Regions:
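Extracellular/periplasmic, surface-exposed regions of secreted and cell-surface proteins
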Residues: 1-250
């Protein structure tokens, strides 16, 4: 992924002639140029298998090499997922009113890189003073990708010929979120990058459906209920100062 942009602003030498070569660079001139190029290389594998139309297993794995991780101790990151489902109605004899039952469970881990230039800060251009200055963020080399771990349990049931019920419970926790913590002015920097926190998201989804047909007339309806809760389980606490090693509270 590549992004480039050049921009300039200032007073006009000739009125109503809007061109960059008509800008008065001596008065109120503002010029800026920026751009970046991100690159991610990955290896992905997936396996799906089943047994006697009763048990089904899915496994996936992926390893990413992202350019944002350059100049860090972690050159790549691996994440995976696993899902298992069991068709109970094919395993044991069910009551006549219960035509189908399936239970399912899954776990997944998803990682994503942090913002570019955090491990290798670039110079900043001030379009007011037309000067370049170094970044005021202390360079960090022990950064890790943001990590989200999720698991889900579900039940699918069809009964009384026309009714269906789908119940799902899910929970996810996100770790290694990137924040900026203040540094002492004597360090020569304004802040440093820290990765911490635990944000939890969990909820329940219920879906009740009804499908029937009478001659040429058919009816299909679905009722859903959703409950979702977000909670901050852990904030930044006791992060070591990269220079002094003293814990810092944010």
């Amino acid at each position: 992924q590549r992004y480039e942009m050049n921009r300039a602003a200032g007073d006009l030498i000739l009125p109503n002639h809007f061109a960059t070569n008509n800008l008065n660079t001596a008065v109120n001139y503002k010029g800026n140029q920026e751009g970046w190029h991100d690159q991610t290389q990955a290896v992905f594998a997936s396996v799906e298998t089943g047994w006697k139309n009763m048990l089904f297993l899915t496994l996936t794995g992926r390893n990413d090499w992202a350019s944002q991780l350059a100049y860090t101790d972690n050159k790549s990151y691996f994440y995976w997922s696993a899902g298992l489902s069991a068709v109970i109605s094919n395993m044991v004899e069910m009551p006549s009113w219960l035509t189908f039952m399936k239970m399912r469970g899954s776990y997944s881990q998803v990682a994503s890189p942090f913002d570019r230039f955090l491990s290798n800060p670039s110079y900043k251009y001030n379009d007011q003073t037309h000067n370049w200055s170094k970044s005021d963020t202390y360079p960090a080399h022990d950064l890790k990708p943001e990590d989200t771990r999720s698991w889900e349990l579900g039940l699918n049931v069809r009964f009384l010929e026309s009714l269906s019920l789908d119940v799902t419970y899910y929970r996810s926790n996100t770790y290694n979120q990137t924040i900026y913590a203040p540094l002492s002015a004597s360090s020569g920097y304004k802040n440093f990058v820290a990765q911490t926190g635990n944000i939890q998201n969990q909820g329940v989804e219920l879906a009740l459906g009804y499908d029937n047909k009478w001659g040429d007339f058919s009816w299909s309806s679905n009722f859903t209920y959703t409950f979702n809760q977000n909670k901050i389980k852990e904030l930044a606490h006791g992060i070591p100062d990269p220079i002094t090693g003293i814990p810092v509270d944010v």
